């Protein structure tokens, strides 16, 4: 089991903490989530601390990321989505840094665990629900009955739409966790296989590993984007009642 590709996902307690009968121990997952947050804050602090008319490369890169998220909100929600920029931007950056941090050797990918991704998805789900009821009141419930639905079909459609709505945080969290775990497992397996091939082919298999790492970095960025854009679409449903 020492060579199992799943060992990299093991949760290890570093500081055992019990509060009110609950286990809130500080783990390797906690460290990497804290590290991802610290790196993100440091990056944007350095980028915007001393803003210049002629921006530095660091400032340009940070502005590109910020404008990317703002454009995502504008395209999916419109001007009404401006107030959600802090939430959506923080969500995207946190997932992105957790995903990329997990690509470093001997690190830990916090977003490969369903408890982490489900917590993020639940945050979006609760926000969408609360915003929907605040903005539309009980009319928000019309979201579960598409316009033009025949009366005889209405009960079935309400059940289906309600089930679909409740399944959103589950599918959102599973998609991110499953993709991050699958990618890391595949990379671990192929890397081990490549080491064996090097006995016979010398350094020829190394380009394969480089390509796979590049692809996994692309997937890490893509999954952060998918999670965020789906969150924007859910917010749009609540705000514009689609």
Swiss-Prot record:
Membrane topology type:
Multi-pass membrane protein
Keyword Cell inner membrane attached? yes
GO cellular component terms given for this protein: plasma membrane; proton-transporting ATP synthase complex
User: Keywords of this protein's UniProt record, alphabetized?
Assistant: ATP synthesis, Cell inner membrane, Cell membrane, CF(0), Hydrogen ion transport, Ion transport, Membrane, Transmembrane, Transmembrane helix, Transport
- GO MF assignments: proton-transporting ATP synthase activity, rotational mechanism
What Pfam families is this protein classified in? ATP-synt_A
Q: Subcellular location, in the record's words?
A: Cell inner membrane
Membrane-crossing segments per the record? 29-49, 84-104, 114-134, 140-160, 181-201, 203-223
Q: Which Gene3D superfamilies match?
A: ATP synthase, F0 complex, subunit A
Task: Note the SS bond partners.
Answer: none
Q: Give the main localization category.
A: membrane
Indicate whether Magnesium appears among the record's keywords. no
Q: CDD domains, per this entry?
A: ATP-synt_Fo_a_6 (cd00310)
Q: What does this protein do?
A: Key component of the proton channel; it plays a direct role in the translocation of protons across the membrane.
Q: What HAMAP family does the entry give?
A: ATP_synth_a_bact
Know the name of this protein?
Answer: ATP synthase subunit a
Q: What is the lineage of its organism?
A: Bacteria, Pseudomonadati, Pseudomonadota, Alphaproteobacteria, Rickettsiales
The gene from which this protein is expressed is atpB
């Amino acid at each position: 089991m020492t060579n199992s590709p799943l060992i990299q996902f093991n949760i290890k307690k570093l500081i055992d903490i019990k509060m009110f009968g609950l286990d809130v121990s500080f783990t390797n997952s906690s460290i990497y989530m804290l590290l991802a947050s610290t790196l993100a804050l440091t990056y944007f602090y350095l980028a915007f601390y001393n803003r210049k008319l002629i921006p530095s490369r660091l400032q340009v890169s940070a502005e590109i990321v910020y404008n990317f998220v703002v454009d995502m909100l504008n395209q999916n929600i419109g001007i009404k989505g401006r107030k959600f920029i802090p939430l959506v931007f923080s969500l995207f950056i946190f997932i992105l840094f957790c995903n990329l941090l997990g690509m470093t050797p001997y690190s830990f990918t916090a977003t490969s665990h369903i408890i982490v991704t489900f917590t993020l998805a639940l945050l979006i789900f609760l926000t969408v629900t609360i915003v929907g009821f605040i903005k539309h009141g009980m009319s928000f419930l019309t979201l579960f009955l598409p316009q033009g639905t025949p009366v005889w079909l209405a009960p079935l459609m309400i059940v289906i739409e309600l089930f679909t709505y409740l399944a959103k945080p589950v599918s959102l969290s599973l998609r991110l966790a499953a993709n991050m775990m699958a990618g890391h497992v595949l990379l671990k397996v192929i890397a081990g296989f490549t080491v064996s091939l090097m006995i016979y082919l010398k350094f020829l298999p190394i380009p394969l590993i480089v390509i796979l790492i590049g692809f996994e970095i692309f997937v890490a960025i893509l999954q952060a984007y998918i999670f965020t854009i789906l969150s924007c679409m859910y917010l749009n449903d609540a705000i514009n009642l689609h």
